[in-house]
């Protein structure tokens, strides 16, 4: 930011790996965990890094935008889908970053459809603190999984009707 004319800093892979049970951070956790659960400690590690970067970027060039591409599902929602979530699986607390003003925009990777898309994109908007939320749509799934064009068009319509700031492809 100090040496280049940039418009933004984007964190694409700002998370722990999905093989969290095998991630080699036992020693660091013992030294620095301070009574927190490992999940909370990991979330805090990422959040501290994001916060330091955001604060430094804004100190140097307040107009530069800071964003990330978290997993498409922020958190588990009652009765809706299972599997990976940003908050519980890879320790991205992007909702917190938005609520505390440490992110200007989110581009969640929403490569799902139907019940795994609609409630989760609405949850991102709710977590977004009126900041920019632009879901990445899984148009590649038309080839890889045989999604129809209508699947994507329905997602575009939904985002337009629910205060979403656009779509990313």
Predicted regions span which residues?
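Active-site clefts of carbohydrate-active enzymes
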Residues: 33, 63-82, 121-155
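Generic structural signal for short, solvent-exposed loop/turn connectors between secondary structure elements
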Residues: 34-41, 111-120, 128-131
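Compositionally biased, intrinsically disordered low-complexity regions enriched in proline and serine
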Residues: 5, 30, 55, 112-113, ...
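Generic secondary-structure transition motif, activating predominantly at the C-termini of alpha-helices
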Residues: 37, 125-128, 160-163
